[in-house]
Amino acid sequence: MKLFGTDGVRGKAGEFLDSFLAMRLAMAAGIYFKDKALTNNILVGKDTRRSGYMIENAIVSGLTSIGYNVIEIGPMPTPAIAFLTEDMRCDAGIMISASHNPYYDNGIKFFDAHGNKLDEQAEAKIEEIYFNDKLIEEARTTKSQIGQAKRIDDVIGRYIVSIKNSFPKELTLKSLRVVLDVAHGASYKVAPTVFRELGADVIVINDKPNGLNINENCGALHPLNLALEVKKFRADVGFAFDGDADRLVVVDEKGEVAHGDSLLGVLALFLKKQGKLKSSVVSTIMSNGALKEFLTKYKIPHETCNVGDKYVLEKLKECGGNFGGEQSGHIIFSDYAKTGDGLVAALQFSALMLSEAKSASEILNQVKPYPQLLHNLKISEKKDLSKLAGLEELKKDLEKKGIASLFRYSGTENLIRLLLEAKDIKLLEKEMKVVESFFMKVLNA
């Protein structure tokens, strides 16, 4: 059984992700981190899901049973855990969240002592330990060796200071009216505080978490309500975060939801103009052709990687870059954060608006994405795509018609994701039927 997916361990709380799995996984991770342990402290944070209490207690039980001391900091954004793990000199950090998923899902993400997400080799090692009864049993401690747990509620200030430090000192948000949709999630306290302390006129929506309403018709995956509020309050811009605030969706003053690649493009150009862009901009293989053209136009080098913000980070380290992201809204400013941080990205976009004295729509309209169609097709078997008879011919045929294509399996479900991109939406709709028919046959869907 494989535990780790594209972003940690994730599943239905109380079913796949129950208290037993959480406790044993924490023990396995603790054993893995022991080799480099310096302080014997591990930081644990969570979003606002009800199941977070169950999983948090199970993780604390697992870690203290093998001798770790645990620092619990309650609901905080995922990027805050990455920052605070290093800032508080912990041996590791653990975030309990299923990000943009509904409340009934949950997940566990791990960070090393420097606040970096674990690579696949580290995850594979933790899985190996998880299934090794002997190693788990030998790691148990007794008597005075059993660890302690303490809850600290005031670390939010450290993270707020770090976020504010990413905003240019010579600017103020006093001239901006901003609507924030915090998705009843982990940023419900942090985001309004940061924007208000920097001077913005702030309207907050969906900031009443009850454990069951996280991401429910709100936040980064449902920005239409935010769009209505932006128009209603005549705001300059709207920012929507997801449940753990590691992604951002922007709504302009007209109530138009920005495309993720438009956001990446204009922020990359902003960094270049300031002389702050190091090396290549990194986006994923799903990025829009219009982004590539925009970056080429401004002579900004560009590289692509697999889908997932940890792969964006890996590629940035490889090429010595400091900016990249995903179409979905994970945007990484690695000079300021170790992972995608919706708040940092929101402040940088605000700084761009103020620096150029332009509206959000004027800025975002510089990158006009080509139409894309993304269909998720249920399948019964995940066959090796490189060996599928007829697939190369299908791709070449699409290419001749001016259609870019990308086909990839879901990391967590029996789905294949079919992405087509071209300048003509009607052509896309027609060819998607051909593509779906092909995969239905070869993958026995």
Swiss-Prot record:
What keywords were assigned to this record? Isomerase, Magnesium, Metal-binding, Phosphoprotein
Q: Does the keyword Cytoplasm apply?
A: no
The entry marks the following residues as binding Mg(2+), namely S99, D242, D244, D246
Query: Catalytic activity annotated for this protein?
Result: alpha-D-glucosamine 1-phosphate = D-glucosamine 6-phosphate
Write out the PTM section of this UniProt entry: Activated by phosphorylation.
**UniProt superkingdom:** Bacteria
* Active-site residues annotated for this sequence: S99 (phosphoserine intermediate)
Give the HAMAP family listed for this entry: GlmM_B (MF_01554_B)
Family membership: Belongs to the phosphohexose mutase family.
Give the function comment from the record: Catalyzes the conversion of glucosamine-6-phosphate to glucosamine-1-phosphate.
Q: What is the designated name of this protein?
A: Phosphoglucosamine mutase
Origin organism is: Campylobacter lari (strain RM2100 / D67 / ATCC BAA-1060)
